[in-house]
Amino acid sequence: MRNLAHPILFVVLDGVGDRPTPGYGNKTPLEAASTPNLDNLAAKGRTGIVYTVKRGVAPESDAGVFSLLSYDPTRLELSRGVVEAIGSGIEFNPGDLALRCNFATAQGGQIVDRRAGRNVSPDEAAQLVEAVNTNEKLRGLIDFELKSTIGHRCALVFRGRAMRLSAAISNLDPAYERQGKITIAKTGVKLPAPIPKCVPLNKTTVARRTAHILNQFASLVNSVLKDHKVNVSRIERGDQPANFLLMRDAGTKTPNVKTLKQKFGFRGVAVADMPVELGIAKVIGIDTRIFPPDRSLEGYSQRGVEALRLMGDYDLVYVHLKGPDEPGHDGDFEGKKKAIEDIDAGFFSRLGDLSSSFLCVTADHSTPCLAKGHTDDPVPLLISGPGVRSDGSMRFTEAYAKKGKFGTIKHGYEIMRILRRLSTSIA
């Protein structure tokens, strides 16, 4: 049973933030999209903009989501690799080394596609993972487990039983780099780009050894995959081969945090499909409802119906909708606009009367189509519910949010404090 009289529905539109785009009337995808349901909600609530981590940081989703859920990622021992391993169900023990991976396309010493065309099927991924997991040379190098998650994405865990491993290593991925305790998206990265080498980030023997193992592992994986029958077939039909494994965001520890219930007394649940959000939910001690990665109107509708049902039992229902992020990465303005419209028509249309509940809608980061990656642009924020006065916003867009009464919120972790204050001030 929930504790709050007025539950909170917290909806994150992955990567929805964008920039005015020439050729589309200098509009953003949110501005160009038809979103009558979101706009109706915006007219009833209050808006603003938020830097999900902080100004100047282009966060990955893990840092953005942790922050939105009240945890300052710059103070955590945060690893996307560990979070995804936990979310995908791989056994992870202290001392193991976990990494987030992509099947990618390498050619002539360069990465030409970080996602192997973004069309690796579940069957193809399963065959490629099996080839890696059963290779004797790789097994002779180190004990490990590679698991396919969704599409080109994988989680990888090196077992630390036989030797010490270090997370103080650079990413073997040209698009992301470590900055302090978090990973940020690099700006201005263009492909093809040279295959990066993993290097130690300190002078310890264990960091040097771990970096050396990763470089050996990457080279051996490439030799295993380049002539695999899956890739022979992909090349024959004109697709990019999935012949390289990008590895990033190493970690050896699970983030040590108070649960959401310990912090706020909230009983929470996450509705999600991606391993990173599911892993975060497990780390902060909230329940999960797992959906297949269905971006159709029906898929969004099912999530809306489930969110409403869960609000009868939980204080906080967190819903993560991936749709807008991928077309942003692909520079596909029309695709991102359609994803937003589908979410409005499928998900938000099912919510009905939320006058006795609190609604928060925002994003974990911006993924502008012109940038084709994450940026540090602030994202729009909408909060509505009992006692929240309308500020006159007519639409849920970046431009209206900049004029909203919440103003500029400097850190995403401030949002949960606002929601707690609102939810506990209404009898």
Language model: regions and residue ranges:
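Feature captures the catalytic ectodomains and active-site-proximal regions of enzymes
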Residues: 1-427
